[in-house]
Amino acid sequence: MTESGRIPLWLVATVAGMGVITLLGIFFYGAYAGLGSAV
């Protein structure tokens, strides 16, 4: 792989994937917590 001062694609994909998983986790946790407290 030739790096020309750019951010590696795998690093971008990893950070983006972790961000999406974190957002999904927070969203589902918030929905579950809200559901549990509402019932």
UniProtKB/Swiss-Prot annotation:
Q: Which GO terms describe its cellular component?
A: photosystem II reaction center; plasma membrane-derived thylakoid membrane
What compartments host this protein?
Cellular thylakoid membrane
GO-annotated biological processes? photosynthesis
Q: Which residues cross the membrane?
A: 7-27
UniProt keyword annotations, A-Z: Membrane, Photosynthesis, Photosystem II, Reaction center, Thylakoid, Transmembrane, Transmembrane helix
User: In terms of one coarse class, where is the protein primarily found?
Assistant: membrane
Q: How does it sit in the membrane?
A: Single-pass membrane protein
Which Gene3D superfamilies did the record assign? Answer: 6.10.250.2070
Q: What does this protein do?
A: One of the components of the core complex of photosystem II (PSII). PSII is a light-driven water:plastoquinone oxidoreductase that uses light energy to abstract electrons from H(2)O, generating O(2) and a proton gradient subsequently used for ATP formation. It consists of a core antenna complex that captures photons, and an electron transfer chain that converts photonic excitation into a charge separation.
Please give the subunit comment from the record: PSII is composed of 1 copy each of membrane proteins PsbA, PsbB, PsbC, PsbD, PsbE, PsbF, PsbH, PsbI, PsbJ, PsbK, PsbL, PsbM, PsbT, PsbX, PsbY, PsbZ, Psb30/Ycf12, peripheral proteins PsbO, CyanoQ (PsbQ), PsbU, PsbV and a large number of cofactors. It forms dimeric complexes.
Q: Which family does it belong to?
A: Belongs to the PsbJ family.
Return the protein name.
Photosystem II reaction center protein J
